[in-house]
């Protein structure tokens, strides 16, 4: 399930216009079969035969795409694909694995590739999740800490640089007995390379302290970690009920290949309550913390597409970030008797409110970032 959000935060109003072209397998209304005698088998229409063929197919895929504009990257030509399938096609009780992928081409030069797969194996005894990305884009650096971030001037000469980087971050989850508890290891390998820093960015104190120069900055990180997860969600990719609670820790150290030694600790709590057909109330509390000799690009971010919408990506960064948020989601329920109603059945909306907190340590809060907005949801499967 993919959705597009248009958000308005209390610090800044950002208008995003995203015309999307949706290519999806058609959904057809049930038609009455041709009249038949008592000793004959009713004939199926071409639409019904196609519907049965699609239902039997293991791999389902959908594509979204089109031009857009974002405050971070300007004009963008983007596309998203969603693939779902069962590892064992003959086991209809098995959870469908989900592989979303996104690609964006920046008209000012650059590309962004991202995937966050969820793979479910036999009996849901074993899962492989992860994050995989490649970016080559123009980005901005606003220093470290709320007091610096909120007043830092964004411009070509003060904050802009060219970023190129890759991340490979799989995690492996094993179910403990017959419980909803999973545990397992994770690996995180990432490389960040900053070039073409702005004229005055090279004099920014935290940039210089980290080792940044007029030629840029680069860092390689290799980490090992663990996860302990409780997951009772009905459908992990788009839950309507249940709870998700995730504890994870990472160690990046020189003896396993990292340029610097530092640690990451994250807690992610989410709860879902069904309020009726295709209506759900969801709320979350998250904390992300880093400790040690933290690289310039590995600080905890507050205000990203994955928590508080509407802020510039990467503007607010420090060693600790905390977010609380609640949102109401609803899809339009139609009888799907016409093609218009079938299309409307894929449309919904979301309204949310929340707040972010950031500081140099988990217990010291220096900045508060309020957030609220409304958005559009599009169901592609």
Question: Which role does the model predict for each range below?
Answer:
Residues 47-59, 87-96, 122-127, 177-180, ...:
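Short loop/turn motifs that connect adjacent beta-strands in outer-membrane beta-barrel proteins
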Residues 53-63, 68-216, 314-315:
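Gram-negative/organellar outer-membrane beta-barrel architecture
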Residues 59-61, 73-77, 95-97, 109-113, ...:
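Residues that define the transmembrane beta-barrel architecture of outer-membrane proteins
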Residues 60-69, 94-107, 113, 243-255, ...:
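Transmembrane beta-strand segments that form the barrel wall of outer-membrane beta-barrel proteins
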Residues 61-63, 97-101, 126-132, 181-185, ...:
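Transmembrane beta-strands of outer-membrane beta-barrel proteins
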Residues 77-89, 113-128, 226-227, 264-274, ...:
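Feature captures outer-membrane beta-barrel proteins of Gram-negative bacteria and organelles
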Residues 84-88, 102-108, 135-139, 190-194, ...:
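Sequence/structural signature of outer-membrane beta-barrel proteins
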Residues 224, 229, 233-343:
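C-terminal outer-membrane beta-barrel translocator/porin domains of Gram-negative envelope proteins
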């Amino acid at each position: 399930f993919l959705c597009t959000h248009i958000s308005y935060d209390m610090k800044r109003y950002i208008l995003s216009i995203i015309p999307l072209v949706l290519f999806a397998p058609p959904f057809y209304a049930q038609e009455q079969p041709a009249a038949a005698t008592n000793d004959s088998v009713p004939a199926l229409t071409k639409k019904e035969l196609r519907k049965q063929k699609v239902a039997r197919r293991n791999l389902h895929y959908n594509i979204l795409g089109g031009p857009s504009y974002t405050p971070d990257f300007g004009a963008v030509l983007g596309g998203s694909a969603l693939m779902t399938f069962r590892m064992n096609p003959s086991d209809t009780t098995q959870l469908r694995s989900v592989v979303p992928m996104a690609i964006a081409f920046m008209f000012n030069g650059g590309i962004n590739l991202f995937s966050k797969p969820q793979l479910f194996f036999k009996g849901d005894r074993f899962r492989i999740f992860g994050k995989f990305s490649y970016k080559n884009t123009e980005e901005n650096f606003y220093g470290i800490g709320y007091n610096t971030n909120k007043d830092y001037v964004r411009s070509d000469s003060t904050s802009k640089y060219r970023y190129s980087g890759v991340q490979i971050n799989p995690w492996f989850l094993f179910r403990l007995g017959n419980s909803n508890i999973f545990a397992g290891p994770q690996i995180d390998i990432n490389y960040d390379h900053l070039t073409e820093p702005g004229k005055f960015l090279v004099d920014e104190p935290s940039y210089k302290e980290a080792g940044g120069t007029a030629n840029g900055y680069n860092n390689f990180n290799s980490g090992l970690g663990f996860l302990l997860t409780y997951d009772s969600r009905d459908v992990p990719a788009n839950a309507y009920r249940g709870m998700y609670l995730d504890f994870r820790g990472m160690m990046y150290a020189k003896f396993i290949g990292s340029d610097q030694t530092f640690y990451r600790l994250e807690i992610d709590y989410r709860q879902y309550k069904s309020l009726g057909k295709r209506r759900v109330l969801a709320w979350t509390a998250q904390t992300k913390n880093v400790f040690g000799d933290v690289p310039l690009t590995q600080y905890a971010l507050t205000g990203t597409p994955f928590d508080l919408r509407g802020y510039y990506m990467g503007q607010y960064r420090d060693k600790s970030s905390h977010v609380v948020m609640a949102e109401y989601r609803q899809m339009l329920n139609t009888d799907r008797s016409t093609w218009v109603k079938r299309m409307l059945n894929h449309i919904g909306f979301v309204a949310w409110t929340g707040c972010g907190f950031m500081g140099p340590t988990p217990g010291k809060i220096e900045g508060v970032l309020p957030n609220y907005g409304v958005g559009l949801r599009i169901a592609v499967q």
